[in-house]
Amino acid sequence: MPREIAMYNLPDAHGHFGPYGGTFVAETLSHALDELRDAYARYQHDPEFIKEYEYELKHFVGRPSPIYHARRLTEHCGGAQIYLKREDLNHTGAHKVNNVIGQALLARRMGKPRVIAETGAGQHGVATATIAARYGMECVVYMGSEDVRRQAANVYRMKLLGATVVPVESGSRTLKDALNEAMRDWVTNVADTFYIIGTVAGPHPYPMMVRDFQAVIGEECKVQMPELAGRQPDAVIACVGGGSNAMGIFYPYIDHASVQLIGVEAAGEGLESGRHAASLTGGSPGVLHGNRTYLLQDEDGQIIETHSISAGLDYPGVGPEHAWLKDAGRAQYVGITDKEALQAFHDLCRMEGIIPALESSHALAYACKLAPTLPKDKILLVNLSGRGDKDMHTVAELSGIDL
């Protein structure tokens, strides 16, 4: 049984979630983080700030996003009812924009005219470029060159929106390398630059701040589910790369002990193959990108190359709050392979007329595995974190089709 987490109030003042989180950064960044922490503490409860944030979410993003009962998919899988939280319907096509708006509003109040971001699948990059255009800010996005190749359409979108995209050639040329480069930029240009991190990782206050801006997802669900289904779900399921869409839907439910929280990681070609990105199910605690969390590392603490069909889950770490929720027994984490995710992707397209992101397809795949083991009156709520337009090339390529 999960240990009872009495009224959840993490992180502590130093950004710790139990033994995870914290601030492991070069001295050169500690001033910037102190400044950010102070600004966030000052504005997070400021009525004017909240009013502007909520206005943008409603009128620019199109929130609240609906919840949809996937009846044909439910029938196909058998068992429990499957509901989808439609983050794919947000402007820019994913959950990422919820967080970017919050951080960009903070950047403006801090007088920083330049924003930088890292991106894997390109969704966070597109959201950042979009909001930078909306507010007239300079924008630079760092992206691993391998991801630039995989996500050509999103790269072009960012450029259309006025951002400069910098391909990163170091390491595995994916998300972790882009994050390293973005941090280097921030150290150099800290006076006029705000670093918009796209997930619940990084040094404090990022994991807390990103979670708070994404929590709008779960807050809406708590209102919508009783209206739609008559009660709260039995389980909430979300994919986990860094883990911001999952934290956004989990956080408001943490104190609801009857709601099971399930995070779905990328098992790639299978956990035993070594080619995966499942930090929580296949990793061990260590320090990466300024925080202590579960990582995919070898005996010497060197980061292992990760693999996933989905660029957005292809990250060797995970948000520290997920690490804590796993150890505390409040959330459970499972793996879904490339093959299973691809099957769920095709199923949703054909049965519901919704093309999901490959990331979200991992959560869907697990819901379809879990549903038949449960009675028909049980309810599974899946966070459909993004739409699949960006994955057309990847999926077509796997089917031997050249777009």
UniProtKB/Swiss-Prot annotation:
The modification N6-(pyridoxal phosphate)lysine is found at K96. The keyword Amino-acid biosynthesis applies. GO terms for cellular component: cytoplasm. Tetramer of two alpha and two beta chains. One of its GO terms (molecular function) is tryptophan synthase activity. InterPro entries: Trp_synth_b_CS, Trp_synth_beta, Trp_synth_beta/beta-like, TrpB-like_PALP, TrpB-like_PALP_sf. This is Tryptophan synthase beta chain. The beta subunit is responsible for the synthesis of L-tryptophan from indole and L-serine. Signal peptide: none annotated. The keyword Cell cycle does not apply. It comes from the Bacteria. Its EC number is 4.2.1.20. Its cofactor is pyridoxal 5'-phosphate. Pathway: Amino-acid biosynthesis; L-tryptophan biosynthesis; L-tryptophan from chorismate: step 5/5. Keywords: Amino-acid biosynthesis, Aromatic amino acid biosynthesis, Lyase, Pyridoxal phosphate, Tryptophan biosynthesis. Belongs to the TrpB family. It holds the Pfam family PALP. It catalyses: (1S,2R)-1-C-(indol-3-yl)glycerol 3-phosphate + L-serine = D-glyceraldehyde 3-phosphate + L-tryptophan + H2O.
